[in-house]
Every structure is written in C-alpha cells, then in structure tokens.
C-alpha cells in the first residue's frame, strides 16, 4: 500500500494565514480609530479653553475702553463747567442719548443761574419796625403802674404785633438768611447760589423764626 501524506495541507495553511492577517489588520484599524478619537476629543478641550481665554481677554479690553471713555467725558464736562476749553481728543463719534440730554441739562442750568453778584440787603437797608410797646403807651390805652399792668401792656403789645406778621416778614427773612446762608454754603460746598437759596427758602417755610409760623391773631379779632 502507498504511504499516507503526512504533511500540512497547503490550502488550509494559506486560509488560516489570510484570516490571521485580516484579523490583525482589523485590530490595527480599530486601535487607530480609538487613538484618533482620543486626540480629537483632547483637541476640542484645548480649543474651548483657548476660546474662553480669548473671550475673557476681549471683555477685559472692552471694559477698560469704556472706563477710559467715561473718564474722558467727565474731564471734558469739568473743563466746560470751569469755563476752560474742553480738550480735543480723537475718539469715536458715538454719543449716547443720555449723554446728550445730560449736557443740554447742564447748559440750561448754567444759563438759568441768577447773577451771583446780587447781594442780600443788610439790616441797615430794611426800614425799622414801629415800637409797639411805645405806641400803646403813647396812645394812653394802658398805663403800667403795677406788675399786673406791665403784664397787661406786654400782652396787648404782643397781640398788636401778631395781628400783622407780614410786616416783620422781610426783616425776619433777611436776618434768617444772614444767619443760615453761611452754614448752608459750608454744608453744601458744591451747590450754586441759586440752589442754596432754594434750600434756604425751604428751611424758612418750616422755621419758627418765620412770623407766619407764629401764632397769628385774626385781623378782625376783637380788641
């Protein structure tokens, strides 16, 4: 009998080799895809980080530019109020509506401000009030011989004075202004004279020194 062939089948070996090669190629491809995905994801994180950094820097520069523009407007406005010429600075022509309205309002206030050279009248220019006590005595209505009579004379004099508080209004307001205006100037150094006088007027309306705030006797009250 002829001997059996003991060697390896060439076709089977070739098939196994092809399968092993295909498997190795598939594994290599899969590994490459995994690596590419990893590096791609890492690149995304880097790009996002750089983008956030750029946006933060841009916001910082914008904020700094706004601060510079605000400072320039304040300096220009101060120069106008002091009567000097505003510095010419080459800037953007964009001006907000609020800035325009604020400038117009300030110019209007400067035009409407009263002449600061006007001085309040002194006590020498105000006519002297009549001595009511002397007039009452001279008319002979009451003669103070005792303490009771003196009290009665003073009461009559106070009533006569309170019948017309407006007669003392001008002199009282002048005295009030001379006494309180320096205090208001010291407490409000940035206010103009017109604003100080408005504030003084409000205090005058509530002041006990105002004759109109004192007890006024009706004009037709019985004597």
Swiss-Prot record:
Protein localization: Cytoplasm, Cytoskeleton, Microtubule organizing center, Centrosome; Midbody
Region feature Disordered, mapped onto this chain: 1-126, 204-223
Tissue expression: Ubiquitously expressed.
Coiled coil (residue ranges): 15-82
GO MF annotation terms: RNA binding; transcription coactivator activity
Any Gene Ontology biological process: transcription by RNA polymerase II
Phosphoserine sites (modified residues): 141, 194
Ligase keyword on record: no
Protein keywords: Cell cycle, Cell division, Coiled coil, Cytoplasm, Cytoskeleton, Phosphoprotein
Primary location recorded for the protein, binned into one broad class: cytoplasm
GO CC list: centrosome; cytosol; midbody; nucleus; plasma membrane
A Pfam family reported for this protein in Swiss-Prot or TrEMBL: Ccdc124
Basic and acidic residues composition-biased segments: 18-74, 99-126
Source species, domain of life: Eukaryota
Similarity-based family: Belongs to the CCDC124 family.
Physiological role: Ribosome-binding protein involved in ribosome hibernation: associates with translationally inactive ribosomes and stabilizes the nonrotated conformation of the 80S ribosome, thereby promoting ribosome preservation and storage. Also required for proper progression of late cytokinetic stages.
Subunit structure: Associates with translationally inactive ribosomes in the nonrotated state. Interacts with RASGEF1B.
Protein name: Coiled-coil domain-containing protein 124
Source species: Homo sapiens (Human)
């Amino acid at each position: 009998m002829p001997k059996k062939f003991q060697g390896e089948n060439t076709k089977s070996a070739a098939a196994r080799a092809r399968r092993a090669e295909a498997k190795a190629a598939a594994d290599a491809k899969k590994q490459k895809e995994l690596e590419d995905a990893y590096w791609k994801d890492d690149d995304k994180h880097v790009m996002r980080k750089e983008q956030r950094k750029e946006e933060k820097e841009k916001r910082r520069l914008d904020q700094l530019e706004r601060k510079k523009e605000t400072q320039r407007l304040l300096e220009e406005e101060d120069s106008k109020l002091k009567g000097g010429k505003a510095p010419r600075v080459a800037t953007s022509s964009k001006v907000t509506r609020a800035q325009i309205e604020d400038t117009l309002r300030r110019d209007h206030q400067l035009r409407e401000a009263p002449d600061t050279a006007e001085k309040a009248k002194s006590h020498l220019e105000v006519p002297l009030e009549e001595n009511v006590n002397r007039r009452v005595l001279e008319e002979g209505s009451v003669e103070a011989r005792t303490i009771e009579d003196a009290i009665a004379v003073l009461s009559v004099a106070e009533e006569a004075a309170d019948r017309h508080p407006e007669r003392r209004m001008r002199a009282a307001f002048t005295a009030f202004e001379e006494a309180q205006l320096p205090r208001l100037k010291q407490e409000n150094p940035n206010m103009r004279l017109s604003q100080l006088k408005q504030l003084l007027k409000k205090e005058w309306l509530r002041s006990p020194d105002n004759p109109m705030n004192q007890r006024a006797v009706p004009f037709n009250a019985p004597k």
